[in-house]
Amino acid sequence: MSTPLEPIEQFLNNPGITYGAHGNFGYVHDFAISPEAFLSFAENDLDSGQSHKDINALSNAKRAIECQMECILKAFTLFSSRITFPEKQVILTKIGLPASTMLNRFNKIRNDLEHRYLPPTPEQARESVELADMFIRSSRNYLDDFTSYFEMENSETGKKICFDINHDSTTISARIIDSSYDSLNDYMNKLPATNTPDSLIICQQPQAEYDRLLRLFGFHMLRIRRRTFSDKRKWHL
């Protein structure tokens, strides 16, 4: 049985597609305390001299990581107060962010404290703070320059696909249109309201198709970001 996403997936499976225009913006969270602030608390805890400094440092390192996770989830319109720490890690991994490898070690230390009530050693506390710092640094760029719109073109078919994420309506959309149009806005402005693209899907959380479309969006968004970062490095060499 075909699904609404099938034309989109078939388009993306074509080896002849190339990346085109994309739009970025700086995503700003609305939390009263930032991930960087929690990280600063954790660093101060390590040097506090208190008997429970390692526990405090680990706890604030966890808050720093989780706050950063939730900032990213909000950027992808996936935030929910009911999602647990491990579930957040799984979601970020599905999107394609490098969360698992970095956080698996942290989870072991965190679980020992939160579920076995074993205090961290000074070395474990310092490692946890360092892991939190690494995670925030490695993922910050995704928020400072978040890709919310991008296009991919197939020169053989003369078609392009336009991905767009809308935070106001909590939706992700994908449209296949003719490559003769400069952009999705150009397409929307020039066609009568009765016309539709070759394929259109708009998924809203928690619709079943949303997770699949989000994975496609995240995968190709990260590929665009890696290519852009590589181009910037070449430019500076």
Regions found by a protein language model. Give the residues of each.
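Charged alpha-helical initiation segments
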Residues: 1-54, 144-148, 161, 215, ...
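Short, charged amphipathic alpha-helical segments flanked by flexible coils
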Residues: 72-99
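Short, charged/polar, low-complexity loop and linker segments
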Residues: 41-48, 85-87, 114-115
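Charge-enriched, short contiguous segments at helix-coil
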Residues: 98-149, 234-237
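N-terminal accessory interaction module
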Residues: 152-232
